């Protein structure tokens, strides 16, 4: 094997862990397992507490209508994450580094601020979700739960210090727990299969009904995470694959398989949350359920089993713990890529978590605990508004043959990707128009 075909000794991995070795031969599943991991770290962002809020509200208020939005946004996410992986593997740069190389310093600062805003919005959702889970499980007041969330910097520090594989194993274990909890709740709720299948078909009502559109954009914002595009383009480089063209092509195939499988799991979980909300709340006339606490309180009485509410709270806590790991990694990648500034993981965690906790405490003090439900959904709309500022640079870079070489995307993929970008921009413009003109 020539020098250019040997695996790179260093990988652009945020925690500076040793690259994960990839077997050169043997069964295909050994190579898939070697590449499995980054996709599941990315999938965490698609199952965070923000998704729960929009899915619960959407299912309770509109029944199965928004299942089509979950499906379409998940397919959009699979495409965009595949392009993010392509950028990292083909160029050896993550999205933030590519922006720094190709854009002016002022543009990079603007993009960095937009991405940090998205990370804080995501962190805000995690603080609220984790605080609610602590309240549901242990009776802690929401404000105290939010303050305790600052201490998760220790958890992140321990996990990152263990290396890439233990970190990925922790995340996959919690994802499995979340999936199992909702699989049981789905069985208990006994949804109407015909209505569920009908919900996966797109309906014009999503665009014509302002309430449906608001929740739909929240689902898009909760599903297609802007900071995940930065995260994935870095994490795929944590594998020690040959940096030759043939090696990159194989790595890209395995990376896309990894992320597509992980995002399929996320699709199933998000659909299950909405289906449970629709079949338990909407079907029984409880269309006013707009937050996670209401959902928890009503699950057991309506289903007749205390287990349903317990599983709901456990899965919510697992979701919040998982998300805190990936937002820390994404924050490191973004800050180092755009600004060449690197903070210790615990310092980075305390900084963003501290900023996210303040609005939760303020809203709780001014409007009570009910105000946090609307804050949670609003955070997902903020995420959606930041999406174009991550998606458009990504599409520019993966189309650039000078940067990507033979791995630049073809015309068909380019047209499809830009159609997705235009759809995201169009949804955001429609939302702004609804806000401006009532």
UniProtKB/Swiss-Prot annotation:
Cellular compartment(s): Cell inner membrane
Membrane spanning stretches: 60-80, 118-138, 140-160, 169-189, 211-231, 261-281, 297-317, 350-370, 375-395, 415-435
GO molecular function, a single term: cadmium ion transmembrane transporter activity
InterPro entries per the UniProt record, alphabetical: NRAMP_fam (IPR001046)
Main subcellular localisation: membrane
Membrane topology summary: Multi-pass membrane protein
A single cellular component GO annotation: plasma membrane
Renumbered residue ranges of the record's region Disordered: 1-20
Keywords: Cell inner membrane, Cell membrane, Ion transport, Membrane, Symport, Transmembrane, Transmembrane helix, Transport
GO biological process: iron ion transmembrane transport; manganese ion transport
Keyword Cell inner membrane: yes
Similarity-based family: Belongs to the NRAMP family.
Function description: H(+)-stimulated, divalent metal cation uptake system.
Name of the protein described by the UniProt record: Divalent metal cation transporter MntH 2
Source organism (scientific name): Pseudomonas aeruginosa (strain ATCC 15692 / DSM 22644 / CIP 104116 / JCM 14847 / LMG 12228 / 1C / PRS 101 / PAO1)
